[in-house]
Every structure is written in C-alpha cells, then in structure tokens.
UniProtKB/Swiss-Prot annotation:
This is 3-isopropylmalate dehydrogenase. PROSITE patterns: IDH_IMDH. Substrate binds at residues 94, 104, 132, 217. InterPro entries: IsoCit/isopropylmalate_DH_CS, IsoPropMal-DH-like_dom, Isopropylmalate_DH. Pathway: Amino-acid biosynthesis; L-leucine biosynthesis; L-leucine from 3-methyl-2-oxobutanoate: step 3/4. Binds 1 Mg(2+) or Mn(2+) ion per subunit.
Amino acid sequence: MTYNIVALPGDGIGPEILNGSLSLLEIISNKYNFNYQIEHHEFGGASIDTFGEPLTEKTLNACKRADAILLGAIGGPKWTDPNNRPEQGLLKLRKSLNLFVNIRPTTVVKGASSLSPLKEERVEGTDLVIVRELTSGIYFGEPRHFNNHEALDSLTYTREEIERIVHVAFKLAASRRGKLTSVDKENVLASSKLWRKVVNEVSQLYPEVTVNHLFVDACSMHLITNPKQFDVIVCENLFGDILSDEASVIPGSLGLSPSASFSNDGPRLYEPIHGSAPDIAGKNVANPFGMILSLAMCLRESLNQPDAADELEQHIYSMIEHGQTTADLGGKLNTTDIFEILSQKLNH
C-alpha cells in the first residue's frame, strides 16, 4: 500500500518546518518499510497570493482524496482583507472534511519541567489531552452580522454534534487514565446546559470513566494551579480554542504542541498549534518540534506506524531533556540543527 499525503506548507515558518519534517519521513519510511507519495499544494496566504483565495477547489479535492494532511502554518499581517483571509481557508477545510474533532496533547517531558513558566513541582508529570469540538459553535453559528452599532454571533449546538465529540473523548479517556473533565458554562449558557445534559447521558455508556464538570473559568484557573489533575478535557469550540492555547504554555513553549483534527472517517489533518511567526520566517531559528510531533501523530494514527511514532517521540524527548533545543527553549540550536540531529538518530 502507498499512502497519499497532502503537504500544505502555508505561510511564515510553515514551509521550513514542514519540509524538514518531510525529510525525516523519508528516513522513517525506509527504516520501517512503508511507501508514501506527497502532493504539495499552496494554502492560506500563499494561495491567496497565487490564486486569489486561501483554499482552491484543486487543493480541497486533493485533501479529500488523501490518507493524511500535513499543515505547516498559515496567516500573517500581510493579508488584511477581512473577506479573504488565510484563516478562512482553514475553516473551510475543516468544515468540508467534517473535521469535528481536534486533539491537542500537552506533555511535560521528564527532566524538562524547568522550561515551564510555572513552578516545576506544579507541572512535572503533566500529561493531558484537550478534545475540542471543531466545526460548530460560535465560529460557525448563524445568524451573524456586524455594523458600527451592533454585532451578533450565534452559539448553536445540536444534540448530535455534542454526542459525537463526547463519545470520542470518553473513548480516549478509557484508553488512558480513565478520567474525563467536561468544560462548559452551564450556569449562564443554554448551549452549555444541553452540553452537560448530553455528557451525563453518554457517561452511562462508559462506566469505567470518571466524569467531572468544570465551568470554563474554573478550568482555566486549575490548568495553571494544578495541571497534573487532568487526563482528558472535552469542550466546545471557543472554550477549546482558548484552553488549549493556555495549556500549550505549560511545557514552556507553543513550539512543543502538536495537534490532530479528524472525523469518523476520511483523512486526518496534522499541524502544530503555533502560528506562522512571520517575524522569524526564513531565519532558520524556528522551533520545529511541534511540527515533528504532529508528524509522529500522523505516523501513529494515519500511516499505521506506531513503532516509528514512538521512536520519533522518544528522540525528541531525549533532545529536550538534554538541552538540544532552539532558543525559545533555552538552547543554542537552529532549525536545521534539530533536523540534522534527528536524522542522525533515526539513521543510527
């Protein structure tokens, strides 16, 4: 079998971190004996510059045919038209592929807790996953309008939309430490009242999982004061967007956090959670670990290569533990150095 992978380098540092990761994929495929082919497509701001839109039909159709999609990063201050922004391409891609699940793990690597802005004793041993609903909620709700006197956004969820994301979260929790935290604002939001009701109903199907509920403001506090208490967190789109960015700083850098977005079937999208960082683009100083860890998720979930994923992750964790990092993590290596060291480790 030959896996079909679509590569979307995007904008800013996206091309340099994705292209380096693809060089690692070539080494890994030879070592673990599997075949793949890559289709490169412009996406986001780069696509706007070339084609006048952030996501062309050609690119979308290629993504629909793919086994996996690897995305570098998109966006930047260059693209200011509110009706034609790079981010709109990503929203359209998620909606078109029905990528309703977003998985964002946060892990504090052994021996690297000193990198966190929080006290070491608070973060050491943190290993949590945020499961974010990705295609509904206030980012997609209708009606919406804006003028100089009034603005309206609609936060809408159906029972079916809540059920499907909650089932994913329960199954993930059951495969880990058996604890699920559901985040809402049930005391004031109608959508959260339905959310909590559905979570409680679905919980009856997963007796092996312990469930607790937290208001989103309380959860944001507990993520900082005691992140080790969490196993799996499930939340709606807006809350998940905010909480996952908050959680990403716990290990010490946005550059350490991967993510995967998927549906019940079809291709999965893998990307680091950081932005395109146009201020450092092309300077060979970007931290590529988030992109490489996203590749590891792709190896495990879409390419059926769990051993390769484990090896890649362990090499990264070892590098971080021994201070072989870029400047944002206190190290002295550049982007190319990271890929060269990992290439040597994988070839060993």
